[in-house]
Amino acid sequence: MAAGSHGGYRGYEVAREREHDVGVSRRSKEHYHHRHPSRHRDSERRRDGGRSGGRELSNGYSHRRDSPRPPPRRRPSEGRTEDREPGEVSGGSGSERSGERPMKTREPRENGVTRVSKEEAKMSPSKKRKQSPVIWDRNGSQRQARDPVRGIREVDAVVAEIIMHQSHSLPVMSSLSSIGDGHSPMILDVSVDKVQEYEKNRIVDEEEEGYPTMRNILTSRWADAGDEEENVFVPKKKKSVSPVDSIERGSTKKVTSPESGEVLVYNSVRSSSRSSDSGVLQGSANRDLEVEKGDNIDVEKAADDDYPAGHLLDSDFEGEDCRSETPECTRSPRRCINMLQGCRSVDEFERLNTINEGTYGVVFRVRDKRTGEIVALKKVKMEKEREGFPLTSLREMNILLSFHHPSIVEVKEVVVGSNDRDIFMVMEYMEHDLKGVMETMKQPYSQSEVKCLMLQLLEGVKYLHDNWVLHRDLKTSNLLLNNRGELKICDFGLSRQYGSPLKPYTQLVVTLWYRAPELLLGAKDYSTAIDMWSLGCIMGELLSKGPLFNGKSEIDQLDKIFRTLGTPDENIWPGYSKLPGATVKFGKQTHNRLRDKFRAVSFTGGPMLSEAGFDLLNRLLTYDPEKRISAEDALNHEWFRELPLPRSKDFMPTFPALNEQDRRFKKHMKSPDPLEEQWMKEQGNNGDRGLFG
């Protein structure tokens, strides 16, 4: 073929003649009539400003685009074929295009890249990619088709048939011979660059608008795969593909005729599209592949920041498939994190004195060298390191680090020592515990002061129960006080979360003096009512400055309870006879003598309690757990609203903090704790214990 400005279009006509020779053309007027003719009329009105009124000129007469008609035949006077696609416009005469600005032709391609004119360079990238076919009239000038979208897709359909039906006998590059100065023909740019896009969108086109879709983040290849479902089909996901890469991708697909109406079946494209050493990708195709792989590496490097050093990510060649099929493949937790690695060292704290040593740890008063703040440092006992980290300490850390309430002690952080056996919890420092203060006082708390303390205690317990946590060891030594009148609950070593329905738990919880009768009788199905019984014992101790029930054993504890509150039966406590410990025979006590301990008016100096206060205490110490008052109902009790009103925290009595020597020699009357006794027997240590037990 002779080189010239008409070479691209004549090459297209030669291909058309070959198509008619082999009989592979399946185009029909019904196919183009079926594809939404109203869409093309809207496109024409926007392009020509409504001048043609939905009609176009072809060979001297007008017709509507949506009217089915065969392509015009070739005129004898012309030396070439003039078959026109339904989306093309033919120029009738020179006067017909006198009022229009001629369009510049696209220059040939070099290494798969099409050079464009300066006017076209000002267009957006999406418009550069989708250029309209050029139509030549008799005089050699050129005009642009009025509907480039349809024209491109119809040319793509023809060229796709030529490439696939003639590839067995005629190579693609030989059928589309070079023209001019050795550049690729213009038809290759139109066919190969768009044929794959046409195949993917042909079936969906009948339900979509015919105009290019605006690119957004949802169609981006980096869209979050976690928000996609497995069966979602995204036909609008497009990216720039070089011609040679398109041929390589097309060779790996089983493609039916674009007009046969069959669904296109795709084989695996991953290996061919991402293999850089196949020997086929050259020039700009290699550059496109390098950019694509570079993008994958950048994204996965950003995700690699969440993984520890040395963690291997998935192969770059499987990244895109993982995002579209299994979102977990890029988010699977493949790391084992030691939470103690990010903890501060205990050397950053200055030790001041030892506060106490309890059953589950030693407590020090220290100063933070970084901030100068005085905090408490509780060392976790690790004597049984063969069995792993202590479960009691693990539960306490988990609960306290997740809770934030004014009535619950705050754990600021966890620090480590020189070895793995030295682990400390950094807590806010409180000057006193309630038991030590009560033994220092000469007179018991007044009713207004008891109300202030009980309100804070009930608020903290309500917060625990609202978050499905049982403390299971509420006692005066586990309640901390400061000189601002604030009370905080501490020592969550026996606490645990509970659920609904209730599960059986161990009954060996709660210090003996504060243990509920159902636990003493061997019940394993219990709930928040055991904490409310402990609050009743604490309230009575605050009023009387001594323990309410100070038994020496479980049987003695039950006997003291029954002597004060009366012996229960099935009428008072339904299900009492079915408890394991109910077989033990106790002395029959029919009267409740609790009122004898707390008089409404005392002339002997004993504890006083109003009728409303006694009602609250009696409801806290109810035998039946189902009838025992809850923390929320207790907060709304009338006792807190009657005179005398609760005292303000600012006016609560203060006491000097005990130094280490005073704590060492001060003897406390202490409740026998079965857990502590068992711990001491296992460790062979019978020494004295402190306040934080």
Curated annotation (Swiss-Prot):
GO terms for biological process: regulation of mitotic cell cycle. Keywords: ATP-binding, Kinase, Nucleotide-binding, Phosphoprotein, Serine/threonine-protein kinase, Transferase. Residues 1-148, 236-308, 664-693 are annotated as: Disordered. Residues 349-640 form the Protein kinase domain. Residues 13-24, 40-54, 75-87, 97-122, 287-304 have a biased composition (Basic and acidic residues). Disulfide bonds: none annotated. Residues 268-284 have a biased composition (Low complexity). Residues 1-10 have a biased composition (Gly residues). It catalyses: L-seryl-[protein] + ATP = O-phospho-L-seryl-[protein] + ADP + H(+); L-threonyl-[protein] + ATP = O-phospho-L-threonyl-[protein] + ADP + H(+); [DNA-directed RNA polymerase] + ATP = phospho-[DNA-directed RNA polymerase] + ADP + H(+). The keyword Repeat does not apply. The active site is at residue 473. The modification Phosphoserine is found at residue 500. It comes from the Eukaryota. It holds the Pfam family Pkinase. Its EC number is 2.7.11.22, 2.7.11.23. The keyword Zinc does not apply. One of its GO terms (cellular component) is nucleus. Belongs to the protein kinase superfamily. CMGC Ser/Thr protein kinase family. CDC2/CDKX subfamily. This is Cyclin-dependent kinase G-1. It comes from Oryza sativa subsp. indica (Rice).
